[in-house]
Amino acid sequence: GKTKGLTAILKTEVCCNQNLAYLIADEKYLHYRYLFYCFKAMYFYIRGLVGESQAGIYSYFLKKLHIPLPDIEQQIRISDYLDTKCEAIKNSINKRERIIEKFTSYKRSLIYEVVTGKKEVQR
């Protein structure tokens, strides 16, 4: 399905079924946010490994993945950098979406006003 291969960081206890993989990083060696970004980077690769016809991703495939493992301090620096950049990108996208919404609303109003005769069309 569409959600196959998606990643998330959960900060609460959850119940999951056989269609989810739950990973806990040993913080001495692997920072959880770094692991999150590694899986985000490998999203299309992971989906390609199992193919579109397969319903899920089995632990067999996850065990075969190679995750680059710099020292923990570097992992944290990488994660902090990506957090900052991804947040800035998300904010930029949100700002542009609000602008698009305003133009879309203006376009609808313009069409309505012209079609109903509330606004005169000049030649």
Predicted regions and their residues:
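N-terminal start-of-chain detector that recognizes signal peptides
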Residues: 7-8, 35-41, 81-85, 93-94
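N-terminal alpha-helical segment
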Residues: 16, 58-61, 85, 107
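Short, charged beta-turn/beta-strand-edge "cap" motif at the junction between a beta-strand
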Residues: 1-6
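Amphipathic alpha-helical coiled-coil/heptad-repeat segments
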Residues: 69-123
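Basic, amphipathic alpha-helical recognition segments used for DNA target recognition
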Residues: 9-13, 20-73
